[in-house]
Amino acid sequence: MIRQRTLKQLVHATGVGLHSGRKVSLTFRPAPVNTGIVYVRTDLQPEVELRADAQFVRDTVLCTALVNEQGVRISTVEHLSAALASLGIDNLYVEVDAPEVPVMDGSAHPFIYLLQSGGIEEQSLPKQFIRIKKKIRVEDGDKWAEFAPYRRGFRMDLQIDFRHPVFDKQNQHLVFDFSGSKFAKEISRARTFGFMKDIEYLHSQNLALGGSLDNAVVLDDYRVLNEEGLRYEDEFVKHKLLDAIGDLYMCNHSILGQFTAYKTGHAINNKLLRALLADAEAWEMVTFEEEAAKSPIAYFGTKLVLA
């Protein structure tokens, strides 16, 4: 049987908020079966819980933010969400003492390491997957994204289109058959990126106050400004794919199907996920309860193998 997963023990870390620039404390706590991923604002009295849910994604400007009906928010959840997807973690309490998850190094890599350090616990009930049954597509001008049936796990086909000298030298198209180990080794270290020309405006809007060359790839009009350069030759499209994995895991379940997108971002990813969940004929919930069943997605293991 393919079982639900949580952590074996509590994990604590600190980091900087991407938009606030403030220190943020982060704690992962194991959760019972069928809890889902629950974010908790511990700086509020009483504490406020926000369950990872496509319907609670109410802000997608520069990040994915969960916002409840009272306006309480937790921002920048997408990189952590991608790490959770790669490890197949179904149930977890994520506690933060600020309105956002710390950005760490701008990728999913530190979150994978932290989660692994807590150990992965397989639980008593079967893991539930969302299987795509028919094509669903959303568009916004020339940008679009779609789901389609695919019987061999989760395939992603993503293309970006940035006009810039650095991007012109890169492959801006990526096809990726999702597995946890491949994600950890080939995708997870891809960092968020931005342009110097936008930073002054962002700061005027109280955004990206914690952004730096330590947690983002920054470009001027001609080149990458980070001394160490890029982590992957195609780091930009890989980060967009990382974002999409995190955004789509807002349904609290791994998806079995094909995701294809052109110039997508947080808003379109969420729009597609909402469109899917709103159409009961487009998907079904499946489990693999046979004793010898193999998971259609190979999740990253529990050994600390990341360098």
UniProtKB/Swiss-Prot annotation:
**Record's keyword annotation contains Flavoprotein:** no
Q: Which gene encodes it?
A: lpxC
Organism, as annotated: Tolumonas auensis (strain DSM 9187 / NBRC 110442 / TA 4)
Q: In which pathway does it act?
A: Glycolipid biosynthesis; lipid IV(A) biosynthesis; lipid IV(A) from (3R)-3-hydroxytetradecanoyl-[acyl-carrier-protein] and UDP-N-acetyl-alpha-D-glucosamine: step 2/6
Question: Which residues does the annotation say bind Zn(2+)?
Answer: 79, 239, 243
Q: Which Gene3D superfamilies does the UniProt entry name for this protein?
A: lpxc deacetylase, domain 1, lpxc deacetylase, domain 2
Q: What is the protein name stated in its UniProt record?
A: UDP-3-O-acyl-N-acetylglucosamine deacetylase
Catalytic activity entry? a UDP-3-O-[(3R)-3-hydroxyacyl]-N-acetyl-alpha-D-glucosamine + H2O = a UDP-3-O-[(3R)-3-hydroxyacyl]-alpha-D-glucosamine + acetate
| Alphabetized GO MF terms | metal ion binding; UDP-3-O-acyl-N-acetylglucosamine deacetylase activity
Q: What Pfam families does the entry give?
A: LpxC (PF03331)
Q: Which family does it belong to?
A: Belongs to the LpxC family.
Say which domain of life the source belongs to: Bacteria
- Name the catalytic site residues: 266
Q: Which InterPro entries match?
A: Ribosomal_Su5_D2-typ_SF, UDP-acyl_GlcNac_deAcase, UDP-acyl_GlcNac_deAcase_C, UDP-acyl_N-AcGlcN_deAcase_N
EC number(s) per UniProt? Answer: 3.5.1.108
Q: Which GO terms fall under biological process for this protein?
A: lipid A biosynthetic process
Q: What does this protein do?
A: Catalyzes the hydrolysis of UDP-3-O-myristoyl-N-acetylglucosamine to form UDP-3-O-myristoylglucosamine and acetate, the committed step in lipid A biosynthesis.
- Protein keywords: Hydrolase, Lipid A biosynthesis, Lipid biosynthesis, Lipid metabolism, Metal-binding, Zinc
> Which coenzyme or cofactor does it need?
Zn(2+)
User: Which Gene Ontology cellular-component terms appear in the entry?
Assistant: membrane
